[in-house]
């Protein structure tokens, strides 16, 4: 078995779960890092969030803790799909930059990311993490499309 891990992007969404399932199907038994990237907020956003959530706690820690919970859920799903998975959480803005940075750091064989299937105006306003990852990564990127009805 190849020791080079795959990187699976996971945010708890249905498209992220489909990405895990696709990775397990294409790379059975492979070592995988399941990554959730939490947004890195500005100081003003952090102060507002901290004061309303947990006084005296650094918001970045709260944000990373939440991302780690999400990544652990994804890693559990990946292990159930027979991948050798470990969770990882990072904070970054934009999200795609955090994904590309981690992929480079772990020398991922491939980045697996789900797509919400946005197009046209919606994609222009909301952005597409999968598109940006594919545009900026220096390694293969597998974009798993949404389920079509």
Please identify what each model-predicted range represents.
Residues 25, 104-105, 135:
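Solvent-exposed polar/charged
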Residues 53-69:
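A short acidic, glycine-rich active-site loop
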Residues 21, 100, 131:
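Active-site phosphate/pyrophosphate- and oxyanion-stabilizing loops and adjacent acidic/basic residues
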Residues 3, 110-136, 146-149:
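Glycine-rich, Arg-bearing micro-motifs that act as flexible, cationic patches
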Residues 1, 76-111, 148-149:
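Structural beta-alpha unit
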Residues 33-35, 86-90, 142:
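General small-molecule cofactor/ligand-binding pocket signal
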Residues 2-55:
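Small/aliphatic-rich secondary-structure junction motif
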